[in-house]
Every structure is written in structure tokens, then in C-alpha cells.
UniProtKB/Swiss-Prot annotation:
GO terms for cellular component: extracellular region. Tachykinins are active peptides which excite neurons, evoke behavioral responses, are potent vasodilators and secretagogues, and contract (directly or indirectly) many smooth muscles. One of its GO terms (biological process) is neuropeptide signaling pathway. The modification Methionine amide is found at M14. This is Ranamargarin. Keywords: Amidation, Amphibian defense peptide, Neuropeptide, Secreted. It is found in: Secreted. Expressed by the skin glands. It comes from Odorrana margaretae. Belongs to the tachykinin family.
Length: 14
């Protein structure tokens, strides 16, 4: 879902 994708992008930023 979008929320999961958003979290993944956030983690990828780290």
C-alpha cells in the first residue's frame, strides 16, 4: 500500500 511504500522510502533515505 502507499503507507508501506512511503515508509520504505523513508527508510531508504536513512
Amino acid at each position: 500500500d502507499d503507507a508501506s511504500d512511503r515508509a520504505k522510502k523513508f527508510y531508504g533515505l536513512m
